[in-house]
Design a protein with these regions (language model features):
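Membrane engagement elements in two modes
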Residues: 2-46
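Surface-exposed, hydrophilic segments of mature proteins
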Residues: 2-5, 36-242
Length: 242
């Protein structure tokens, strides 16, 4: 009889011990799935590339150009001496260093016409485009022609406006520069449109391409992204209302 009672107590004790172990395991498992870690002062944020193009007509008031901004007049009547100029600067509005280049639009449209001699022509073949850094608005068209004389070239799709990639750190902006398009006074009747078939050009604009620059450092140096794939932010400013 005593032996049976002892066995019964042992079984009950063992069962209680097993239940306690199970309860502890359940509690531990619950803790694994609900445990959290947080910091009160650190914010983890992915770097972003954000390039903006600012434009001005007077070097005083600046506006952000969008894809709908028209920087040049599509309705211009191009003739010898006629000049259009816009002042630009590129801004790094992101939190990563970037490098950019600027070029003339690939997507402008040129329609051929007939000149007063009856010959076919395209007006863009007689237009010049050039750039110049400037801190003030040019006083007259002659000053524009003189400033861009060293780098002007015939208007063409994707003409580069920068000689190389230019690096901007976060929050930094480029020096202001002028982009001018004009018809030289030396052009004659070869681009003098007949009333019936004038040549026209539309969609004149600027394209800015940017990619990440090798500036930020990790625990070793600033070359961690030197072999990263080149991803371009490409923004074109051609259409809309100026």
């Amino acid at each position: 009889m005593t032996s049976r009672k002892s066995t019964k107590r042992a079984l009950i004790t063992s069962a209680l011990a097993i239940l306690m172990c199970v309860a502890m395991l359940i509690g531990t498992t619950f803790a694994w799935f609900t445990d959290t870690a947080s910091t009160g002062v650190n914010k983890i944020q992915a770097g972003n590339l954000d390039v903006k193009l600012m434009y001005s007509t007077d070097m005083q008031t600046w506006h952000e150009a969008t894809e709908q901004t028209k920087l040049f007049d599509d309705n211009a009547l191009w003739e010898p001496g006629y000049t259009q100029v816009v002042y630009l600067k590129v801004v790094n509005a992101g939190n990563l260093a970037l490098k950019y280049e600027a070029g003339f639009s690939k997507n402008y449209t040129s329609n051929r016409g007939k000149n007063v001699n009856g010959d076919w022509y395209r007006v863009d073949n007689y237009l010049k485009i050039g750039t110049a850094e400037t801190a003030t608005k040019f006083e007259n068209r002659e000053a524009v022609w003189s400033a861009i004389a060293a780098n002007e070239r015939t208007l063409a799709k994707d003409v580069m406006l920068t000689d190389e990639w230019i690096t901007l750190n976060p929050g930094q902006e480029s020096a202001p520069f002028a982009v001018a398009i004009y018809m030289p006074t030396s052009v004659g009747n070869e681009a003098n449109a007949s009333k019936a078939r004038p040549s026209s050009v539309s969609g004149l604009g600027i394209e800015v391409r940017a990619t990440q620059a090798t500036v930020e450092s990790d625990s070793f140096d600033n070359n961690y992204d030197a072999n990263a794939a080149t991803v371009l932010n490409r923004v074109e400013y051609t259409d809309g209302v100026h």
